[in-house]
């Protein structure tokens, strides 16, 4: 069964590289990509990065791999909150000084931590990909 389950960006990249890439319009945005710890450990981060590189017009900055500090539910606990912020502080500083339009991460808990502490809208890679999709039905009506 495990051979039948793929991470979404791995699946999409495989499809795109097999000739099934959708038409995309340029997304003239600068984004910083944060690698979630669990995605890096599983070896799946390269799929997300390669998929994001396929978005035309996108300025992609891959941040150094650092923990956001949330660590699952660790940072949600009141007694760990300050330590959690300290763990992620270098990452938050890098994001705040990046002049990016968005931060991008595959992990929802990283998203919460980044938005709370770096004060930048953070989106999933698939949401960014959706921005680039060309709606064929809209084009036909025009």
Regions found by a protein language model. Name each.
Residues 1-142:
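Iron-sulfur cluster-binding electron-transfer modules in prokaryotic oxidoreductases
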């Amino acid at each position: 069964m495990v051979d039948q389950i793929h991470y979404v960006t791995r699946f999409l990249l495989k499809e795109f590289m097999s000739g099934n890439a959708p038409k995309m319009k340029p997304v003239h945005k600068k984004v910083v990509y944060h690698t979630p710890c669990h995605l890096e450990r599983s070896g799946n981060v390269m799929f997300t990065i390669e998929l994001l590189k396929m978005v035309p017009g996108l300025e992609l900055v891959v941040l150094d791999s650092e923990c956001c500090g949330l660590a699952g539910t660790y940072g949600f606990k009141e007694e760990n909150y300050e330590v959690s912020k300290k763990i992620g502080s270098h990452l938050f500083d890098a994001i705040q000084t990046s002049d990016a339009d968005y931060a991008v991460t595959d992990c929802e808990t990283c998203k919460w931590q980044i938005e709370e502490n770096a004060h930048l809208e953070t989106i999933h890679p698939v949401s960014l990909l959706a921005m680039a999709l060309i709606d064929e039905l809209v084009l036909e009506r025009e």
